[in-house]
């Protein structure tokens, strides 16, 4: 029986793509790095920030961003993101509020594991009025083996004393699916975020949904 759901936030619950891309492009410009397209930047969403920039400028690129410079990019990104992040900038995806409420009423433990900071997750959960339903939050600084590693899932399982077969991960990118599978947990991929159906299929995702409301059907399949 399903006991616990671990949700990604960006691209799964909150529609943050535009502010993320704006912040990444502004960071690239401020740091004097070669241009990258929005598509290239979007492909990094879901990774820890430093890794986003080291992956955008790898060893074979015209400009290399190592770990040290990647950390500087990450700090610049956070500052710019905070500047751009005005109230109402990040909406929930369709059917998230009522579906989250319905899942909570079923007695399922609802949690979030994200590559963004714990502080910003707390703020979004509060501002988007999800605090009544979300029982546990993990940001990138809360775990050692961050997404796509299994760290966030394993820590959540330990917190709630659950087995892998009692939990699912819900996310919009291959990194979410890899995190789930690396921890021995099944995954739900959403197609409306930053990833694609093809990406989910390539990761052998157990369920692929086009609308958050379909989470009710996924959960019912466990009963």
Which positions does each model-derived feature cover?
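Conserved phosphate-coupling serine/threonine residues in phosphotransfer and NTP-handling enzymes
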Residues: 12, 114-116
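N-terminal helical cap/lid subdomain that shapes the substrate entry/recognition surface
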Residues: 2-97, 104-106
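Residue-level marker of regulatory loop/turn positions in helix-turn-helix DNA-binding domains and
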Residues: 92, 113, 145
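Asp-based, Mg2+/Mn2+-dependent phosphohydrolase catalytic module
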Residues: 1-5, 101-104, 117-118, 123-223
């Amino acid at each position: 029986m399903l006991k616990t759901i671990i949700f990604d936030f960006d691209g799964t619950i909150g529609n943050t793509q535009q502010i993320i891309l704006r912040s990444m492009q502004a960071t690239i410009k401020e740091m004097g790095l070669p241009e990258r397209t929005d598509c290239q930047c979007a492909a990094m969403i879901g990774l820890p920030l430093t890794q986003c920039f080291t992956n955008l400028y790898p060893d074979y690129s015209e400009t290399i961003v190592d770990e040290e410079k990647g950390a500087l990019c990450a700090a610049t990104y956070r500052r710019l993101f905070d500047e751009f992040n005005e109230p109402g900038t990040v909406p929930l995806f369709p059917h998230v509020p009522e579906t989250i409420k319905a899942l909570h009423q079923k007695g399922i433990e609802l949690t979030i594991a994200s590559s963004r900071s714990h502080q910003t997750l707390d703020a979004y959960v509060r501002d988007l009025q999800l605090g009544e339903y979300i029982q546990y939050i993990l940001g990138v600084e809360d775990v050692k083996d961050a997404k796509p590693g299994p760290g966030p899932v394993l820590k959540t399982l330990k917190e709630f004393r659950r087995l892998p077969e009692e939990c699912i991960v819900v996310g919009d990118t291959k990194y979410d699916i890899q995190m789930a599978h690396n921890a021995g947990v099944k995954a739900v991929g959403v197609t409306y975020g930053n990833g694609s159906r093809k990406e989910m299929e390539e990761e052998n995702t157990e369920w692929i949904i086009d609308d958050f409301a379909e989470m009710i059907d996924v959960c019912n399949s466990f009963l």
